[in-house]
Amino acid sequence: MVSSFFMASTLLAISSCFNSSISRAKGYNDSLESESLEFDVVDVVDVVAAEGTAPAVVDLAPDIFRSFLTTQLFFDNQIPVVIVVEISSTLVLLLSAFLRNLVP
């Protein structure tokens, strides 16, 4: 239970920081009124099973960073995975976590 709470808190913190960075980038762009610094919605979401484990099946909500904690994750055999999120081919965020305690 403690591990689940810790992981949920960590994911929420990552999500908040990411959203804050996007807001600052858009605000900076608006103040300069120059070439746009656009962050598109998630273009690519690849889910890669951690080395030596079975393949994972994951269902991710499209607004992954706005409501990360409500994302439904379904793992085969409750295995650890690495979630690779690529946004506009400019930002790659690697989230590596052992999520077996978060799976109901």
Swiss-Prot record:
Q: Where is the signal peptide?
A: 1-25
Predominantly, its location class is: membrane
Where is the protein found, in the record's own terms? Membrane
Write the record's keywords in alphabetical order, separated by commas.
Membrane, Signal, Transmembrane, Transmembrane helix
Topology versus the membrane: Single-pass membrane protein
**Cellular component aspect of the GO annotation:** membrane
User: Keyword Membrane: yes or no?
Assistant: yes
Q: Which residues cross the membrane?
A: 79-99
Please, what other remarks does the record include? Partially overlaps TPD3.
Name the chain's protein.
Answer: Putative uncharacterized membrane protein YAL016C-A
